[in-house]
């Protein structure tokens, strides 16, 4: 049993990008699917597909990873911020700027999962799920 499925998903993505895998499979949930779709919209992942593998009882999210022209990693750093043991909530004014605006902080708000720029624009704070650049 996993105590933090979001951290597991981020670790799988981190490990797959470091070994230059084309795809990575993670156990599916609605929250993870929203997070994966946000990564696609921000340009860090090429695609996401919800599927069921042969003989598996549960759905799986298959993320197609993205690399640069010379196979350099698009995701250079990915880190879980708010954990089950220590939640991290911030107001709209205190949303972190990641790598001087070149990175993304993923924030869970009352309007759904949003990148930090969008949350700042809408004036909503929330729980900082992870940061990446």
Swiss-Prot record:
UniProt entry keywords in alphabetical sequence: Ribonucleoprotein, Ribosomal protein, RNA-binding, rRNA-binding
Q: Which GO terms describe its molecular function?
A: rRNA binding; structural constituent of ribosome
| Matching PROSITE patterns | RIBOSOMAL_S8 (PS00053)
What Pfam families does the database record attribute to this sequence? Ribosomal_S8 (PF00410)
Q: What is one Gene Ontology biological process annotated in the Swiss-Prot or TrEMBL record?
A: translation
Q: Which GO terms describe its cellular component?
A: ribonucleoprotein complex; ribosome
For the keyword Transferase, the answer is no
Report the protein's function: One of the primary rRNA binding proteins, it binds directly to 16S rRNA central domain where it helps coordinate assembly of the platform of the 30S subunit.
Quaternary structure, per UniProt, is:
Part of the 30S ribosomal subunit. Contacts proteins S5 and S12.
Q: Which family is it part of?
A: Belongs to the universal ribosomal protein uS8 family.
According to UniProt, the name of this protein is Small ribosomal subunit protein uS8
Question: Which organism's genome codes for this protein?
Answer: Deinococcus deserti (strain DSM 17065 / CIP 109153 / LMG 22923 / VCD115)
């Amino acid at each position: 049993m996993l105590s933090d499925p979001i951290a597991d998903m981020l670790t799988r993505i981190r490990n797959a990008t470091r070994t230059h895998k084309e795809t990575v499979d993670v156990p599916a949930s609605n929250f993870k699917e929203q997070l994966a779709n946000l990564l696609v919209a921000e340009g860090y992942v090429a695609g996401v597909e919800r599927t069921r593998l042969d003989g598996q009882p549960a759905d799986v999210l298959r993320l197609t990873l993205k690399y640069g022209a010379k196979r350099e990693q698009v995701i250079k750093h990915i880190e879980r911020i708010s954990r089950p043991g220590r939640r991290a909530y911030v107001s709209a004014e205190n949303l972190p700027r990641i790598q001087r605006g070149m990175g993304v902080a993923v924030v869970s708000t009352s309007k759904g999962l949003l990148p930090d720029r969008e949350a700042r624009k809408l004036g909503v704070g929330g729980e900082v799920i992870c940061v990446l650049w």
